[in-house]
Amino acid sequence: MATVIRRLEENDSVESFDCGDGPLNGYLREHAWNNQQKSSIGVTYVAVEEAAPRTVIGYFTVASASLAKDALPRKAVRGLPGYDLPMILLARLAVDRRFAGRGLGHALLSEALKIAVRVSEQVGCRCVIVDAYSTAVEWYQRYGFIAIEGGRGSSHRMYLDIRTIKAAQQSRQSGQV
């Protein structure tokens, strides 16, 4: 079955979405649409199957953010100005449990990183940051994310440099990966 990733729409069915995490389920059901349409503080992209184009089976939310230069490793910010650096925040990423283990998380993350590259070419941003759950740290590390200081509560702040993302995308396009 083909999966489509697109922006969240008002009439999408989110009530049956269950990733096994209450706050991630609640965000999609109660906040994603308002944050996107009314508050303009995040944009949510959803995965749907072509056969059920309104039923959300996965999602991610991206927003703009900034990070103090000294929060990143020295080698990552060498030569940059001393003020806060623009970032893309991967604020949420979740897959419905019924669709876990099928590569949907990978597809969602790949789309989020493509969006980050496009944004960086329009307005400039240095990295993608995520505050990962402890259970997701290794998963993000497999994609090149690096742990740094920070995070909220029990989450772990991680970053991935836009230049690294671009290099990986170019390698894939040229058939090197």
For every predicted segment, state its role:
Residues 43-50:
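Cytosolic beta-strand hydrophobic patch enriched in CBS
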Residues 53, 59-92, 100:
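Conserved acyl-donor/pantetheine-binding loop and adjacent beta-alpha core of acyl/acetyltransferases
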Residues 57-58, 149:
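A structural microfeature
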Residues 101-115:
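Conserved acetyl-CoA-binding loop-helix of GNAT-fold acetyltransferases
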Residues 123-135, 149-177:
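C-terminal "cap" of GNAT-fold acetyltransferases
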Residues 130, 140, 145:
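Conserved active-site tyrosine of GNAT-family acetyltransferases
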